[in-house]
């Protein structure tokens, strides 16, 4: 949050830099997410995931503090500060990738099938809660603003986050992972073999494409929704900022419904995760079509309700995607969970970063081509809707693994082609 929001604002407002500078730095942080499969493989081969999680958090904390220092240096020497910032944002990406991939693999290893929707909901809720608390606390302590205060507050938040991570993980991981096959090491050859195995699994491959396409669609409106509301509906900066809160409220509602509903109905309807994911994608497409239709500029359009609906659909889709990720990650066996989770984390990071860039670039390109501003924004929303529709079509074709209960084989009533691979306990 500090790296992608607070430092972004300081570079643009306080230092007067072009938005391209922080945009490129944040893009570098997303770009290195392609290394996530390697971090996941390391935690698989190492026998324990906790060291990778804490190591990633420590690297993230140091890099965020370094990034704040680099921004302060920019005020006196832009070239030196930019060089430091590039290194720090790359390290931020590595820290996020190592910690996030290993944490999700740990959660997937310990969570029973029936509890995965609720677990995915809790993970997202805790992430949003952490962002909210950090934003409120740092906003209070950063005023009156100075570069020295920025560095001090960032360092304090980083130190506190590291301490919380250490306490939260104490005693969670009992024992070690099952021993890898004889001769398996952390070598690059072993990593390549594991990655090839995951890619040759049709369900894992389809899910990778699904994550990439859906995250592009998910993030394309990230940088354009507030400008759209200001241009088409004449909203003030304060009003468009509250619109973001309305959307996040919808996300929370969708996650709660998806998490609780998915957990409650998982045993009776094994295909509930697939149905939630498809429903979330289609509802997201419908909400985006409505936003595109509202570009005519009718101030009577219920924009807040439309944005809440978009957030709700996104939340429903997100919970189903994370829970499905946990289930599919375990299908490769406990010594491949981290690598598979890393593969999908890489697809998520690259898709999210690319989507935000493409959304903003598409608006600029259409306006340069002579399209009115409202039509340009509507065009991007239509592209997003098409992306979510394609994601729904991909999700329908993904067969989720399931455990076979003692009473006999359980099949997915909604999908005769549901596979019979067993996820490990």
PLM feature spans:
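Glycine-rich segments within core transmembrane alpha-helices of 12-TM secondary carriers
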Residues: 32-34, 117-142, 251, 344-359
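A membrane-interface helix-boundary motif in multi-pass transporters
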Residues: 49-51, 80-81, 139-159, 269-275, ...
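C-terminal ends and interior cores of transmembrane alpha-helices
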Residues: 54-79, 279-298
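Intracellular juxtamembrane helix-capping segments at the cytosolic ends
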Residues: 96-111, 316-333
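Juxtamembrane intracellular "pre-TM" segments in multi-pass secondary transporters
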Residues: 175-208, 232, 407-425
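C-terminal transmembrane helical hairpin of 12-TM major facilitator-type secondary transporters
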Residues: 273-321
């Amino acid at each position: 949050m500090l790296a992608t929001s607070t430092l972004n604002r300081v570079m643009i407002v306080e230092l007067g830099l072009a938005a391209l500078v922080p945009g490129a730095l944040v893009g570098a942080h997303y770009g290195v997410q392609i290394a996530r499969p390697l971090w996941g493989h390391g935690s698989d081969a190492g026998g324990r995931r906790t060291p990778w999680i804490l190591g990633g958090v420590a690297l993230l904390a140091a890099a965020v503090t370094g990034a704040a220092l680099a921004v302060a240096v920019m005020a006196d020497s832009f070239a030196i500060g930019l060089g430091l910032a590039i290194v720090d944002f790359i390290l931020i990406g590595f820290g996020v990738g190592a910690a996030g991939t290993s944490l999700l693999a740990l959660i997937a290893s310990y969570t029973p099938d029936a509890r995965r929707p609720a677990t995915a909901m809790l993970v997202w809720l805790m992430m949003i809660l952490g962002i909210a608390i950090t934003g409120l606390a740092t906003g209070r302590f950063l005023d009156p603003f100075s570069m020295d205060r920025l560095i001090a507050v960032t360092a304090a938040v980083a130190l506190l986050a590291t301490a919380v991570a250490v306490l939260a993980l104490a005693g969670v991981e009992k024992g070690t992972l099952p021993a890898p096959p004889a001769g398996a090491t952390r070598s690059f050859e072993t990593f390549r073999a594991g990655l090839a195995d995951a890619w040759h699994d049709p369900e894992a491959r389809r899910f990778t494409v699904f994550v990439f396409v859906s995250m592009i669609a998910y993030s394309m409106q990230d940088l354009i929704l507030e400008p759209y509301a200001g241009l088409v509906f004449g909203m003030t900066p304060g009003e468009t900022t509250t619109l973001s809160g309305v959307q996040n409220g919808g996300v929370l509602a969708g996650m709660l419904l998806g998490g609780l509903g998915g957990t409650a109905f998982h045993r009776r309807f094994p295909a509930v995760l697939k149905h939630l994911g498809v429903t979330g994608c289609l509802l997201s497409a419908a909400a985006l079509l409505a936003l595109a239709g509202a570009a005519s500029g009718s101030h009577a359009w219920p924009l807040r309700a439309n944005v809440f609906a978009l957030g709700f659909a996104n939340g429903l889709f997100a919970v189903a995607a994370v829970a499905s990720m946990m289930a599919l990650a375990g299908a490769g066996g406990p010594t491949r969970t981290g690598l598979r989770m890393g593969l999908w984390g890489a697809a998520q990071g690259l898709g999210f970063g690319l989507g935000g860039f493409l959304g903003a670039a598409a608006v600029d390109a259409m306006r340069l081509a002579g399209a009115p501003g409202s039509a340009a924004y509507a065009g991007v929303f239509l592209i997003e809707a098409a992306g979510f529709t394609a994601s729904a079509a991909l999700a329908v074709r993904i067969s989720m693994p399931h455990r076979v209960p003692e009473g006999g084989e359980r099949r997915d009533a909604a999908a005769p082609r549901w596979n019979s691979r067993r996820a490990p306990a």
